[in-house]
Every structure is written in C-alpha cells, then in structure tokens.
Regions:
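Short helices/loops that flank or line small-molecule/ion binding pockets
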Residues: 81-93, 111, 161-162, 180-187, ...
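Short helix-initiation/N-cap motifs at beta->coil->alpha
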Residues: 73-83, 103, 173-179, 252-266
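Hinge/lid segment of periplasmic solute-binding proteins
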Residues: 102-153, 179, 205-207, 294-296
Length: 354
C-alpha cells in the first residue's frame, strides 16, 4: 500500500477521525465555571488513566494549600479522547489537564484546543527529558504538554508459566527462538502473548525490524507511506502471520478488556511485548500475578540489541480563559512531570522519561 499526502492533510484527516460522536460545532476552549471554591481555593480537574498520578495529589496539595486537585479516570486513550472531544465541542465539561499520548497530541494542537506551556516557562526543561519525549511535546515552536512517561519496549513475562514450559526468556534473543518458546508455552495450555489487531503494536514491531515505511518529501511537507514495498515490514508480517497460523498467539481476547486482564491474571496470556510503562498496569489489572512477573530484553529478528518504542504520554492543558486555573494546572503538571518528589512518587513500578 502506498499513499502520499501533505502533512497538513494527514493531521486534518487524523483529527477528523478522532471526532467520534462530536458535533460539528462548538467552542474549542473550556468554558467551565470559575474554579475558586468557597474556601478560596482554586480547584482543578485532571483526566488521566495513569494509576500512579493520584498518588501525587496529597503531597502537592500540602505544598500548595490554595489548590485542590481532582483526578478522574475518563477511560484509556481513545475512550478518553472521545469524552474530551465531546466536552470541547459542547464548550463545557472539559478538564483543566488531560493525559494525551504523544501520537495524539498534534491533533489537539492543530485544532487550537490546548495551551502552549511556554508561557509558563516550560521551554526551560528542554534538557531535562530525553530528546525523543521532548520532541513529541514541542510542536510548531511551542511546548504543548509535559512528558509523563516513555515507552521503550520490554518483554514482560510470567515466570511461573515459563518455568513450567522450560523456557528462560533471558536466553531468547531472536524471533526464531521466540517462535520456539511460543510452541513450548502453548503446550502448557497458555499463549505466549496476545494480539487482537493493535495498530500501535504493529508499528512498534515493524520499527523493531528496522522498517522505515514513512518518508518526507524534499519539500518538507509531503509524506509518503509505503508498507508493501518495505522488506522489513514484510519480515515482521511474515513472522507474526506464522505465529497466528500456528495458534501461538491469542487473537480473540481484546487488549485492555476485562477478559484480557483475567487472562494475564491466571497466566493464560503468559507475556507481553509492550512499553516500559506496563508494570503498574499489571499490578492493578493482574493482582494475582504479583511476584510472578519478570522483564527481559525484546527479542529481535536477528538477535541484535536494538529496540523500539510503544506508547508514552503527556499532560496537556486545555485552552482556558481562567488565569487562576491555568496557573494552578501548570503547577500541578510541573510537579507531577518535573519535580523530583512528584516523579519519584509516580514512577514506582515504571520507567521515567528522562
């Protein structure tokens, strides 16, 4: 498949695709009522599916007694984005801060729905984060979010299941060895992993194979996507299709569903190839596996020590005319994403983005 379009067209198409159930009209700013409570405190609302973020609230409020923070889980990625789009379209009900993955951030920036945090001094943090995460939030000369986490890939596995199968994942380096390990795990009744058609996972694995199906024209504007003629894309597709054909991957259990968590919990799905942010999700979604999970390097096509990324997200501020709420929201974002104590509290069980 080959497709060529301008960057602007791609951004607009992507933005339109995210406008599920959103009316065609409405304000792009958050017109919620003043956030000042009866006690004179400024109240801010944060939407985030990150289970570690609420841990930071108590210490933040202690250090900032004039601010009250309410963290709400409005759903994971696309579920949250739909709710956010609906609120933005209606002109009310949007949060002050919202967790947005790096891939989705440009869509909200293009539509003018999030604040440039440079006005609060966020630009000075350019050397604090890894280059990749900083580049993901620095758009069109502005800083439109603060990085929360990053997603270098890792192989998380249930040691009990792999011990039963007689497989040591730390010695599995190539995709051929991964295939052999999958057969042994399947013989125990479990699947080595699951994949119900995750496009993000597909991207991550093709990048791991060395694929570069996306290219920018000499004009700096046109973008070409060519999947069918990239040999490295074929390397992954052929390998993964063989795994599926041989019933070595659970393709029926949807990722992030209750059944998926149940399968991780009981060992039916024995491992995951995913972002380094996964540990705290395992702790909350598969509590019976506590103490059983381990991590190994990603197996690669030829065993070389290369890696890819999967996911990663940021805290962005929804456009607002309320200066007090904006300043309070930025203080919390900086505390959670930059302050040493805030980061220490959040990254227990994860990998920071610096």
């Amino acid at each position: 498949m080959k497709f060529t379009a301008s960057k602007k067209t791609i951004a607009l198409v992507a933005a339109a695709a995210m406008l599920t159930s959103v009316a065609a009209c409405g304000s792009s700013s958050n017109s919620s009522s003043s956030g000042v409570t009866e006690g004179g405190k400024t109240e801010i609302t944060v939407w985030s599916w990150d289970s570690t973020l609420p841990r930071t609230v108590k210490d933040f409020e202690k250090a900032n007694p004039d601010i009250t923070v309410k963290v709400t889980n409005a759903g994971t990625n696309k579920t949250e984005y739909t709710a956010l789009n609906n609120a933005l379209s209606a002109g009310k009900g949007a949060p002050d801060l919202v967790q947005i993955e790096y891939y989705a951030l440009p869509e909200y920036q293009v539509r003018g729905e999030i604040e440039d945090l440079s006005q609060f001094g966020a630009g000075k943090f350019s050397d604090f984060y890894t280059p990749g995460t900083w580049a993901s939030v620095k758009l069109n000369g502005g800083v439109y979010a603060l990085p929360m986490d990053s997603g270098p890939m890792a192989w998380f596995y249930n040691k009990d299941v792999f011990d039963k199968a007689g497989v040591d994942p730390t010695r599995v380096r190539t995709w051929d060895e991964f295939y052999d390990a999958a057969k042994k795990v399947r013989a125990t009744g479990s699947y080595i992993t699951s994949d119900s058609g995750d496009a993000g996972f597909f991207d991550s694995m093709t990048w791991l194979a060395g694929a570069t199906p996306f290219s920018t024209g000499s004009d700096g504007q046109s973008v070409t996507i060519n999947l069918s003629n990239d040999s490295k894309v074929k390397t992954f597709v052929d390998f993964w299709q063989k795994m599926i054909d041989d019933d070595l991957i659970d393709t029926k259990t949807a990722g992030w569903s209750d059944d998926w968590n149940k399968s991780l919990n009981d060992g039916s799905i024995a491992s995951l190839l995913t972002g380094a942010w996964m540990p705290y999700n395992l702790l909350s979604g598969a509590p019976d596996g506590e103490g059983k999970w381990r991590v190994a390097q990603m197996p690669t096509p030829d065993g070389s020590e290369t890696n890819s990324e999967n996911g990663g997200s940021s805290l962005a501020m929804v456009k607002t005319d309320d200066k007090a709420k904006a300043e309070a929201a930025y203080k919390f974002a900086e505390y959670a994403c930059h302050n040493a104590e805030g980061i220490k509290t959040r990254v227990a069980g994860g990998i920071p983005c610096r």
